[in-house]
């Protein structure tokens, strides 16, 4: 009921708002179906149920666009997931999917509209998301990349002007990050090992 009230409040405050909800695969088909029948018009629901089979059943019951996120992102091989009749839109998050090239290849493979979104990264990761988004000739849905404000501190500024962001070259500023030198080295080494594996 709280979630339905929140949606109603957003709709009341801004009737033009595009409303998206993200469930992270936590609903059963019945829960999703009942909620979506009551919530009114939304742009889409992201990963309402966990499995492809559940998503397929839900899609046959409701007239709401369904986005697949975890169903691909957490798969050992997202190219082998059969999305036929299960979702309408693919969620692309650069880092969890293995980089810009792989995310783009995944979109081409599944031949569905995409939403390019962040996985709550710093400005560096969001810049990669912007680069992926810019590589598509056309996007049917707005990107979900305006998440930098959710971080207490960021390594660079990526301003949003009139609802738009620009791909930006910048030198990251790590001074404001609250982390120990040991932890910073651990992350740096992990990134270097990962980069080596991807070569």
Question: What annotation goes with each model-predicted range?
Answer:
Residues 1-64:
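Metal-dependent enolase-superfamily TIM-barrel catalytic cores that perform enediolate-based chemistry
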Residues 3, 122-125, 184:
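Generic structural signal for well-ordered, non-membrane alpha-helical segments
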Residues 20, 37, 84-85, 179-180:
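Intrinsically disordered, low-complexity regions enriched in Ser/Pro/Gly/Gln/His and often acidic
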Residues 24-25, 70-72:
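Short beta->alpha junction loops
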Residues 29-30, 34, 157, 176-182:
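Short alpha-helical interface patches
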Residues 50-65, 72-174:
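Shared catalytic-loop signature of beta/alpha-barrel
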Residues 176-199:
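Extended hydrophobic packing segments that form well-structured cores
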